[in-house]
Amino acid sequence: MPDYIRTSRAADSLRDIKITPHFLPHTDGSCLIECGNTKVICTASVDENAPPFLHGKNQGWVTAEYGMLPASTALRMRREASAGKQSGRTQEIQRLIGRSLRAVVDMEKLGERQILIDCDVIQADGGTRTASITGAFVALQIAVGKLVSDGILSENPILEAVAAVSAGVVNGVPLLDLDYPEDSGCDSDVNIVMTASGKIIEIQGTAEGAPFSLDELGKLVALAQKGIGELLRYQQNALSVA
């Protein structure tokens, strides 16, 4: 994108963010997260049976699944179920979501049960994995809060909040929260998952058009940290009315 200049918002600004809690009635926790034109439904379902590899260990598990509706993109995507297998991208993203959430949960306090996270992209315009992580935390917190209020858990096993955002270099300019045109035409980009205390869970970085320096990486991380701070406040606001 040699002539691209972002004009719709500042280089260090998020897209318009909206998180609607309790978006679906038939699950323990849910929300719709909207990051600009990217929209993801996130749900959390409690299963009172821990996975087999944890039986008898007095600890729980959090896992995630991720998918995109066929019409979530400009050209219809074939359902992965009809292809008979998940793509490598899908498997990578759902593992990332699961890892990100497990990093902020005390599994012993969760007890011998698992929480199943589902992230379904209904409209995609870049940043679906980061939006999924940010929304999934809200759904998880709602589900866990229900376990506590119902007396099933004596204390909340969630240690702190977690959120994620992208940043990238487009036409030599570091930008926060890339939309699809920016993401597809960037020089380099990163996806960063960070806790409320500022600890990094994961950094995924790739040079798409040109390698980037450690100094540029530092600028992208700083941009992401700013954006994640704002996303954490959106999460708090959504949970305060949940």
Swiss-Prot record:
At the top of the EC hierarchy, this enzyme's class is transferase
- Reaction it catalyzes: tRNA(n+1) + phosphate = tRNA(n) + a ribonucleoside 5'-diphosphate
Please name one Pfam family that this protein belongs to: RNase_PH
Positions binding phosphate in this chain are 89, 127-129
The GO terms describing molecular function are: 3'-5'-RNA exonuclease activity; tRNA binding; tRNA nucleotidyltransferase activity
The EC number(s) this enzyme carries: 2.7.7.56
Q: Which SUPFAM superfamilies match?
A: Ribonuclease PH domain 2-like, Ribosomal protein S5 domain 2-like
GO biological process per UniProt: rRNA catabolic process; rRNA processing; tRNA processing
Q: Keywords in UniProt for this one?
A: Nucleotidyltransferase, RNA-binding, rRNA processing, Transferase, tRNA processing, tRNA-binding
Q: Sorted alphabetically, which Gene3D superfamilies does this protein's record hold?
A: GHMP Kinase, N-terminal domain (3.30.230.70)
Give the multimer and partner information. Answer: Homohexameric ring arranged as a trimer of dimers.
* Assigned protein family: Belongs to the RNase PH family.
* PANTHER family xref list: EXOSOME COMPLEX COMPONENT, EXOSOME COMPLEX COMPONENT RRP41
Under what name is this protein listed? Ribonuclease PH
